[in-house]
């Protein structure tokens, strides 16, 4: 049992390192841009009626904060507000519909209540990368109560689970054609607005804090901003992440 838990954590660590590797590479490219949406689905209570929350960031700039209680759209630069609003408005309804669908799926998913401690808590991270010469694609990461993990790649419509237990849930979810369609077409429905905003030059915020841990990737805090000096720093970070990835694989053996 303990070995299985450790193996599960290793799989999750490797999965996060792969995402970090992707960001480390694209952050080293001057023309690389990204849209990231963090979704949270949880059980509401009388004291806290919040059951879903969505935050979307473009190149670390928060453009949309949406929940079943309120909605806020913002941009880091007044000159970008109009375009950020267009992106936020386009994403709002699809995200609302998706969160409702996710809530239904979590409610109907059988999980080990000892692992989930009651109603499952779902975290979903969508990452859309855009870089010249590369095909734009989105990656969806699913984390159910820090116990079940799986990923969907829209580029080749493939799924990957962290372990067998996660695979059981993943296979049921991927057989839902309507659900998969929502994941696949969320970005294409707003592709024009998103791409236009991503193409705009932006003054990205500088970070004075240390790099986030792997577990912070699924939180609502922004990712570390790219370097503006040279692409060399980006490739150095890739090398460090790659070394960490090798260690993770070694421990998982």
Swiss-Prot record:
Cite the record's Basic and acidic residues compositional bias ranges. Answer: 197-206
**Cellular location of this protein?**
Cell membrane
Carbohydrate-modified residues are: 38, 70, 83, 143, 156
Name a biological process GO annotation.
Answer: cellular response to exogenous dsRNA
How is the polypeptide modified once translated?
Glycosylated.
Summarize tissue expression: Expressed predominantly in embryonic brain.
Q: What induces it?
A: By retinoic acid.
GO MF terms, alphabetically ordered: natural killer cell lectin-like receptor binding
Protein's UniProt name: Retinoic acid early-inducible protein 1-alpha
The source organism is Mus musculus (Mouse)
């Amino acid at each position: 049992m303990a070995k299985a838990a450790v193996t599960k954590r290793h799989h999750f660590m490797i999965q996060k390192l792969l995402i970090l590797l992707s960001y480390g590479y694209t952050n080293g490219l001057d023309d690389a841009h990204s849209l990231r949406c963090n979704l949270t689905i949880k059980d509401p209570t009388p004291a806290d009626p919040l059951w879903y929350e969505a935050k979307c960031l473009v190149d670390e700039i928060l453009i949309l904060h949406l929940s079943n209680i309120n909605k806020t759209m913002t941009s880091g630069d007044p000159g970008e507000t109009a375009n950020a609003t267009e992106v936020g408005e386009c994403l709002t309804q699809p995200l609302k519909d998706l969160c409702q669908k996710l809530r239904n799926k979590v409610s109907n998913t059988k999980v080990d209540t000892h692992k989930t401690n009651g109603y499952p808590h779902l975290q979903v991270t969508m990452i859309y990368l855009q870089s010249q010469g590369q095909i734009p694609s989105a990656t969806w990461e699913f984390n159910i109560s820090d116990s079940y993990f799986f990923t969907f790649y829209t580029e080749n419509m493939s799924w990957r689970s962290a372990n067998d237990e996660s695979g059981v849930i993943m296979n049921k979810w991927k057989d839902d054609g309507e659900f998969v369609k929502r994941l696949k077409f969320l970005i294409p429905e707003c592709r024009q607005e998103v791409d236009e905003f991503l193409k705009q030059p932006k003054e990205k915020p500088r970070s004075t804090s240390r790099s986030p841990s792997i577990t912070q990737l699924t939180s609502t805090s922004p990712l570390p901003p790219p370097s503006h000096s040279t692409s060399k720093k980006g490739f150095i970070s890739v090398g460090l992440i790659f070394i960490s990835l090798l260690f993770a694989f070694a421990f998982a053996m």
